[in-house]
Amino acid sequence: MKTLHVQTASSSYPVFIGQGIRKKACELLTSLNRPLTRIMFVTDEEVDRLYGDEMLHLLQEKWPVKKVTVPSGEQAKSMDMYTKLQSEAIRFHMDRSSCIIAFGGGVVGDLAGFVAATFMRGIDFIQMPTTLLAHDSAVGGKVAVNHPLGKNLIGAFYQPKAVLYDTDFLRSLPEKELRSGMAEVIKHAFIYDRAFLEELLNIHSLRDITNDQLNDMIFKGISIKASVVQQDEKEEGIRAYLNFGHTLGHAVEAEYGYGQITHGDAVALGMQFALYISEKTVGCEMDRKRLVSWLKSLGYPSQIRKETETSVLLNRMMNDKKTRGGKIQFIVLNELGKVADHTFSRNELESWLNKWRLEETS
């Protein structure tokens, strides 16, 4: 088991990473020295089917536990589901010494975390991610639900009290979910660690990744994320760099319809556009064709649907949280492993997006 410590302006908490950690859940939670009267255990339908009863029985050995299951997929991050979980917490007689455990992927973590942040003005919250994608979202304290006009527009910054990351769960993931999570690992390498990126470029099949490689990738990815969050907890500066690939990615997700494309596939599209615009506007030197070819070889899409209009995507991007005064703050690379933000007008970005789309279809 590996342990990382995240220190932010508002809190400090451990991240436990390793195989079989779920079996030590009671021991690890007790080690936090937090008063725990009751636990609401939130999971999704798919994770519940595979591991829900096992985790419920483990936790019930020590505390009163209420299990609440939400639909699998992005549709669970809704105000309706948020209200349902608040009602479940009230009916279960949760108090300020109670705790919510998010047992699932990023959707469950975002939803359950936002409930914890707002129930009785904030109660303890534990992340137990079960996907590779959630290695990114479980650390850093961003919790939210979606609005029909945009992703993650209603939320808060609320740090967990601990993250328990059992890597055994990742071996049961379908390949599309493994690929989705790998996109965030790749993002971390693009923006902060060129040597790590070179390591990743040697991977040609996601199913050939060994347990040791997987644990190492997760540890490096979380270490990069933790380092950024420690310096900028509430995205007032460098934390925005973690949105590399996400400005277009979120627009594509929203326009296709949540659940119609995985978050990682959408971010991979966004990163390919970000590489293009980094090369064309700030002169980032790289072998872009090699990078794009590698992403394609791992199964990531390289083109936006032809029927999706560029102007519609720009409308989505104008609603992005990084937009200021009608200008879009877009995360670019000065060089591989070194990131910066760049401001574009709507017309500028629309022009570059049209040029990139034309290049990808030629």
Curated annotation (Swiss-Prot):
EC number: 4.2.3.4
Record's subcellular location: Cytoplasm
GO biological process per UniProt: amino acid biosynthetic process; aromatic amino acid family biosynthetic process; chorismate biosynthetic process
Domain of life per record: Bacteria
Catalytic activity field: 7-phospho-2-dehydro-3-deoxy-D-arabino-heptonate = 3-dehydroquinate + phosphate
Enzyme class, UniProt record, top EC level: lyase
UniProt keyword list: Amino-acid biosynthesis, Aromatic amino acid biosynthesis, Cobalt, Cytoplasm, Lyase, Metal-binding, NAD, Nucleotide-binding, Zinc
Predominant subcellular localization, coarse grouping: cytoplasm
Positions annotated to bind Zn(2+): E184, H246, H263
Cellular component terms per the entry's GO annotation: cytoplasm
SUPFAM superfamilies: Dehydroquinate synthase-like (SSF56796)
Entry cofactors: NAD(+); Co(2+); Zn(2+)
Molecular function terms, GO-annotated: 3-dehydroquinate synthase activity; metal ion binding; nucleotide binding
Positions that bind NAD(+): 72-77, 106-110, 130-131, 142, 151
Pathway field: Metabolic intermediate biosynthesis; chorismate biosynthesis; chorismate from D-erythrose 4-phosphate and phosphoenolpyruvate: step 2/7
InterPro entries membership: Dehydroquinate_synthase, DHQ_synth_AroB, DHQ_synth_fam, DHQS/DOIS_N, DHQS_C
Cofactor annotation comment: Binds 1 divalent metal cation per subunit. Can use either Co(2+) or Zn(2+).
UniProt function note: Catalyzes the conversion of 3-deoxy-D-arabino-heptulosonate 7-phosphate (DAHP) to dehydroquinate (DHQ).
Family membership: Belongs to the sugar phosphate cyclases superfamily. Dehydroquinate synthase family.
This protein's name: 3-dehydroquinate synthase
Origin organism lineage: Bacteria, Bacillati, Bacillota, Bacilli, Bacillales
Gene: aroB
